[in-house]
């Protein structure tokens, strides 16, 4: 029964992976083509491209981990190459979260309207320093990933190996104090960008409220470009927050799985849920970006035209064959 559930979850993971690769590859391809065409890249496009690349890598690592867990369980328990996979999973996980946080921060500084000198100073310089901020996210993610991977995943592999040898649920003896401290370190590391996004969300709401109040006092109405920009930014940030919460819970299931009776099943279940975040959020970003949305509509229109053309050719061929008979 457990094997059937694992196989079903694996097929689900493959479907989520395909959707995620399609959306993130589209974002990266459109922005790179625009970069080559204009020979420069806007800050928002740089953030979206970096986020798309990190999520493509994250999707590949998670799916590879699922395949090894289901198809090669011995390698999963004892293989030294799993340390490499664990490192890249932790790295791409933090890169994806921090790049999404940078996107929320960028929306906040570009759209929000405050008159504090510090805010105005940062607002004027956000485009100049965004590349350095992204580079800092890479360095910080590497710094977090190295010690966390070495401590947390060594205990996990030992537990899987012990359970396979003894076939007992609670026979795994791990250093729970070390596991708890490492897990706390990982959770705090992901909690910081979440708090930053949450702060950006509430400040955007405050900025929108002030803007609407000013528009009402001036009797010019509430629906203007600035209001619509606020609403689009809020939708993007809140979608990230909700998906991140689901991803965070699935991450907790995966990292805590060796305290559960069915370790492997808990891991692949957590990973299949975790794939929803990098897969679905890319399409939300496409719909919220004018350039990406227009490019996607062009692609859909071309695909529909090709399909209609093929269907017309098939009907035409059938008509010719009917006339011959």
Swiss-Prot record:
Residues 1-9, 77-94, 150-187, 257-266 are extracellular. GO terms for cellular component: plasma membrane. CDD domains: 7tm_TAS2R7-like. InterPro entries: GPCR_Rhodpsn_7TM, TAS2R. Gene3D superfamilies: Rhodopsin 7-helix transmembrane proteins. It is found in: Membrane. Glycans are attached at residues 167, 175. SUPFAM superfamilies: Family A G protein-coupled receptor-like (SSF81321). One of its GO terms (molecular function) is bitter taste receptor activity. The chain crosses the membrane at residues 10-30, 56-76, 95-115, 129-149, 188-208, 236-256, 267-287. Pfam families: TAS2R. It comes from the Eukaryota. Keywords: G-protein coupled receptor, Glycoprotein, Membrane, Receptor, Sensory transduction, Taste, Transducer, Transmembrane, Transmembrane helix. Residues 31-55, 116-128, 209-235, 288-319 are cytoplasmic. It is a multi-pass membrane protein. Gustducin-coupled receptor implicated in the perception of bitter compounds in the oral cavity and the gastrointestinal tract. Signals through PLCB2 and the calcium-regulated cation channel TRPM5. Several bitter taste receptors are expressed in a single taste receptor cell. Belongs to the G-protein coupled receptor T2R family. This is Taste receptor type 2 member 7. It comes from Pan paniscus (Pygmy chimpanzee). The lineage of its organism: Eukaryota, Metazoa, Chordata, Craniata, Vertebrata. The gene is TAS2R7.
